[in-house]
Amino acid sequence: MAATLTWILLFVGLLAGLRDTKAQQTTLYPLVGRVFVHPLEHATFLRLPEHIAVPPTVRLTYQAHLQGHPDLPRWLRYTQRSPYSPGFLYGTPTPEDRGRQVIEVTAYNRDSFDTTRQRLLLLIEDPEGPRLPYQAEFLVRSHDVEEVLPSTPANRFLTALGGLWELGELQLLNITSALDRGGRVPLPIEGRKEGVYIKVGSATPFSTCLKMVASPDSYARCAQGQPPLLSCYDSLAPHFRVDWCNVSLVDKSVPEPLDEVPTPGDGILEHDPFFCPPTEATGRDFLADALVTLLVPLLVALLLTLLLAYIMCCRREGQLKRDMATSDIQMVHHCTIHGNTEELRQMAARREVPRPLSTLPMFNVRTGERLPPRVDSAQVPLILDQH
């Protein structure tokens, strides 16, 4: 009975866990060419009642990716300063990204190790209203990217920029961290920020003040370490510290000329004084060159062979001339060596043989003669030179 109750409790807990882990779905409508910002608030993933605030000690981190892919799409970025602060998904979709995209977000509770999933259905559409051909980009060094992404500071920047760009309605086109543009990580000193690039667009032309700031003369002064040419009051200060030496203006009101398509020709070059075509080469007979290349090495090899044969065959002294030039004593000694060698070979062939003559005392090694047997061998000196 107790085992059955335990299994029932486990099954109920499993169903509750499956119900809690079911992903929520939110539909969003980003616009092509306009900045898109979606905050990932802790309250959304903790599912707390409305009257209960999120505890400040709760730590949540997020992981977002495109459905069916390990990472986010190329136009979308994610940032979160710390687990105590909310995360942000931001970016500017391009015309190639138009359509439907599903972003899966997983929240991790670092204290209780709970996970919560959320699906963001992005329906990317074209913006309504007039085009924004006049675009200006500013580098704000007094803020980090997550400090500008909320709507309040972004609207405050547009309102302050209206003092420099009086006419027309301003809209945010893109927000990029300076670190993504090759900026350096600031030192851990109070007041140092990473910096953020903010691109703003409008349907009205640039003001005279902005044109003067982005003029070549102003850039030349910045290169020399002097302040830029700012003829109007800086309405962005002191809330936004803009680097006026990094202001870029883009005018897309004039359509760019289309690249001329090259027309294919007939393949025949016209008369050109700088083009010298190669002359026609006359026919050549390579038989003589081939004979010289083959016959000369063969003749040289044949002459060397004949010379070597003459030296080896015709320049020998001969055995008779060699024997006549050799002394008799040396010849006898040579013959004795050969005779002794043959005698030793015969002795090795059979065991019981008489003593060799060369070992007998009556045998003269030099002359080869033998003493008479009647001579007493005891009186024969061992060394013949002694008598």
UniProtKB/Swiss-Prot annotation:
The modification Phosphoserine is found at residue 377. Keywords: Cell membrane, Cytoplasm, Cytoskeleton, Glycoprotein, Membrane, Phosphoprotein, Signal, Transmembrane, Transmembrane helix. Residues 312-387 are cytoplasmic. It is found in: Cell membrane, Sarcolemma; Cytoplasm, Cytoskeleton. GO terms for molecular function: calcium ion binding. Residues 24-290 are extracellular. The keyword Membrane applies. It is a single-pass type I membrane protein. Gene3D superfamilies: Immunoglobulins. SUPFAM superfamilies: Cadherin-like. Pfam families: Sarcoglycan_2, Sarcoglycan_2_C. InterPro entries: Cadg (IPR006644), Cadherin-like_sf (IPR015919), Ig-like_fold (IPR013783), Sarcoglycan_alpha/epsilon (IPR008908), Sarcoglycan_C (IPR048347), Sarcoglycan_N (IPR048346). Strongly expressed in skeletal and heart muscle. Interacts with the syntrophin SNTA1. Cross-link to form 2 major subcomplexes: one consisting of SGCB, SGCD and SGCG and the other consisting of SGCB and SGCD. The association between SGCB and SGCG is particularly strong while SGCA is loosely associated with the other sarcoglycans. Belongs to the sarcoglycan alpha/epsilon family. Component of the sarcoglycan complex, a subcomplex of the dystrophin-glycoprotein complex which forms a link between the F-actin cytoskeleton and the extracellular matrix. This is Alpha-sarcoglycan. The lineage of its organism: Eukaryota, Metazoa, Chordata, Craniata, Vertebrata. The gene is SGCA.
